[in-house]
Amino acid sequence: MASLLYLILFLLFVCISYYFTYYPTNKLQAAVMETDRENAIIRQRNDEIPTRTLDTAIFTDASTVASAQIHLYYNSNIGKIIMSLNGKKHTFNLYDDNDIRTLLPILLLSK
C-alpha cells in the first residue's frame, strides 16, 4: 500500500514539474510567449511575400518613360517597401501619402 502511495506522489511530482517547466507560471512569461507567437506570425507573413523582380515603366520626366527592372521587398513590421532600381535603394513608407502616390504608378505599370 505504501509503494502505491509513493508511486502516486511521484507521478503527481512529475506532472507538477512538467507544468512548471513548459507552461508560463507568471505574467511576464505569459506576455513574452504571446509576443514571441505574434512575432513568429509576422515573420511568417514576411516570408510568404517573396522578394520580387518586376519589369515596370518608370517616369523619369513628365514626358519620358523608361522601362526598368526593379527588385521589391515588403516589410510588414515597419510598413515599408524597399525598392532597388539601378543599384539605388529607395524606401517607401506605407503610412505616408506622398510615398504611396509615388509607389502606386510603379506597381500598377509593372508586370
Swiss-Prot record:
Membrane topology: Single-pass membrane protein
Keywords carried by this UniProt record: Fusion of virus membrane with host cell membrane, Fusion of virus membrane with host membrane, Late protein, Membrane, Signal-anchor, Transmembrane, Transmembrane helix, Viral envelope protein, Viral penetration into host cytoplasm, Virion, Virus entry into host cell
Gene Ontology CC terms, in alphabetical order: membrane; viral envelope; virion membrane
Pfam families: Chordopox_G3
One GO biological process term: symbiont entry into host cell
Topology, Virion surface side: 22-111
Main localization of the protein described in the UniProt heading: virion
Induction entry: Expressed in the late phase of the viral replicative cycle.
Transmembrane domains' residue ranges: 1-21
Secretion signal span: none
Post-translational events: Unglycosylated because produced in viral factories instead of the classic ER -Golgi route.
Subcellular location: Virion membrane
Role according to the record: Component of the entry fusion complex (EFC), which consists of 11 proteins. During cell infection, this complex mediates entry of the virion core into the host cytoplasm by a two-step mechanism consisting of lipid mixing of the viral and cellular membranes and subsequent pore formation.
Quaternary structure and interacting proteins, as annotated: Interacts with OPG099/L5. Component of the entry fusion complex (EFC) composed of OPG053/F9, OPG076/O3, OPG086/G3, OPG094/G9, OPG095/L1, OPG099/L5, OPG107/H2, OPG143/A16, OPG104/J5, OPG147/A21 and OPG155/A28. Except for OPG095/L1 and OPG053/F9, each of the EFC proteins is required for assembly or stability of the complex.
Family, per entry: Belongs to the orthopoxvirus OPG086 family.
UniProt-recorded name of the protein: Entry-fusion complex protein OPG086
Source organism of this protein record: Vaccinia virus (strain Western Reserve) (VACV)
